[in-house]
């Protein structure tokens, strides 16, 4: 019975909504959660993967609260736009995610 750790997230540094803000605290948190999932999977536990919250991709939030015509981010319309989103420009976070993807792909080979 495999389990997936899902919908964990962490705001951008300083609770900023800007896509140019740093993500150092988020990166540390993701590394921690990924280590728990990866260590459990590597030791034969039930975790098979994880899903972070949430993918903002190429969105460019124009307002703190979503308005008609704004890009959709990983944050739902009723929440602050960009706060928990991982954008395509968040290189350090994407590097953390890639490291976890590579680790999980190698577990069980």
Feature annotation, model-predicted:
Residues 11-13:
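Active-site environment of divalent metal-dependent phosphoester hydrolases
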Residues 15-32, 36-109:
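Aromatic-rich peripheral "rim/lid" segments of glycoside hydrolase catalytic domains that contact
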Residues 4-7:
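Active-site neighborhood of phospho(di)ester-bond hydrolases with catalytic His/Asp-centered motifs
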């Amino acid at each position: 019975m495999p389990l997936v750790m899902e919908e964990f997230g962490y705001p951008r540094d300083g609770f900023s909504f800007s896509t140019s803000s740093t993500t150092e605290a988020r990166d540390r948190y993701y590394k921690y959660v990924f280590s728990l999932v990866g260590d459990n999977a590597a030791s034969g536990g039930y975790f098979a993967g994880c899903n972070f919250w949430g993918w903002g991709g190429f969105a460019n939030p124009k307002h703190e609260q979503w308005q008609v015509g704004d890009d959709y981010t990983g944050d739902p319309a009723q929440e602050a736009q960009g706060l928990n989103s991982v954008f395509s420009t968040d290189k350090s976070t994407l590097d953390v995610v890639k490291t976890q993807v590579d680790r999980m792909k190698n577990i069980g080979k």
